[in-house]
Regions:
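Primarily recognizes the serine-hydrolase "nucleophile elbow" in alpha/beta-hydrolase
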Residues: 151-215, 230
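Conserved alpha/beta-hydrolase "acid-adjacent" motif
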Residues: 255-264
Length: 323
């Protein structure tokens, strides 16, 4: 019941925001299934058990966050701890792809509408099953977001046959893009390795303060991390020939996360002969995600459909080839 109340509360906030702005009423897509990643909370080292079989691992570190989540009118969620969960969205016409979706928010919040519900709305229209992760915020416990994403992969792999899934990729935005890139380079095994990656205006480099997004670096690693730790969590330094094929999208003039972050990851992929593509749009800035008119100003404006076409083509290329 608690997880249902959380989802309904976010939807109500979205509706209220639309009414206050005198915009057409927007009813956000609701998940078909919401699953707590740690049903017994972070204090118990246990994951999800179904039919007597454990299909995910436990929480590992406890991020120390207690009490209810805090959700603002834009659907940005803070204070995620025991309530870490996945929202599953099933398309009407599934094409065999699934995406583990990582909303951004500087590792301080999770952007559950713009980069969660709205993303799922478009992706399911393309036939993609979506597993959007409301991951634990690190609170200076750096391992917890990646642990949650890897458990989301384990959950989806366990249900792949049931859902008709042949490939599971990862997608992320800003700090969520950093998380998606980290999942693409620091995976634990074949189960947690993404089959493909989609990075939208991602934070990549954590080594250089003039390049990185300082809030993301601080939120994940703290104020004075070691050089080895910074290198480990700078995904461009962890790329190998086994890193998944990657789609990168960003705006040329991003004053929040400098575009050089994307360039560095793209160059690392090329250096290791990993298939990759990068799309740079002349407007949009940062954080445009999947917000769209008339419900919210669209930063991409006339390039929205260009982005959709580019991403749809990449996803189409991920479909199993007919023999």
């Amino acid at each position: 019941m608690k997880k249902i109340i959380i989802a309904l509360g976010i939807a109500a906030l979205c509706l209220a925001a639309c009414k206050q702005a005198k915009q057409p009423e927007y009813v956000p897509l609701q998940p078909d299934l919401t699953v707590l990643l740690y049903p017994q909370g972070q204090a118990v080292d246990a994951g999800i058990v179904e039919n007597g079989q454990q299909i995910t691992l436990g929480p590992g570190e406890d991020n120390g966050l207690r009490g209810p989540e805090v959700v603002n009118p834009n659907g940005n969620i803070a204070n995620i701890g025991d309530s870490a969960r996945v929202d599953i969205y099933f398309p009407k016409n599934p094409n065999g792809l699934c995406i583990v979706n990582c909303p951004g928010g500087g590792y301080q919040i999770v952007s559950s509408i713009n980069e969660g519900m709205c993303a799922a709305e478009w992706l399911t229209s393309q036939g993609v099953t979506v597993c959007s992760v409301n991951y634990r915020l690190p609170n200076f416990h750096r391992t917890v977001p990646l642990t949650d994403v890897q458990n989301a992969f384990r959950y989806c792999r366990a249900h792949a046959q049931e859902w008709g899934i042949s490939k599971i990729g990862v997608m992320g935005y800003s700090a969520g893009g950093h998380l998606a890139a980290t999942a693409s380079t620091l995976y634990a095994d074949d189960i947690t390795r993404p089959d493909f990656s989609v990075l939208i205006y991602p934070v990549i480099d954590l080594t250089t303060l003039s390049i990185t997004h300082v809030g993301t670096r601080h939120g994940l690693l703290g104020e004075i991390p070691s050089e080895d730790l910074v290198d480990l969590y700078s995904p461009q330094k962890q790329v190998t020939p086994e890193t998944p094929e990657t789609f990168i999208a960003l705006s040329a003039y991003d004053n929040v996360v400098p575009p050089v972050n994307s360039f560095m990851y793209f160059q690392a992929l090329q250096a290791h002969n990993v298939p990759c593509q990068m799309h740079i749009y002349p407007i949009g800035g940062h954080g445009w995600g999947f917000y769209h008119e008339p419900y919210h100003p669209d930063g991409l404006q006339q390039y929205r459909e260009v982005f959709y076409t580019d991403l749809a083509r990449f996803l189409q290329d991920q479909l199993p080839k007919a023999e």
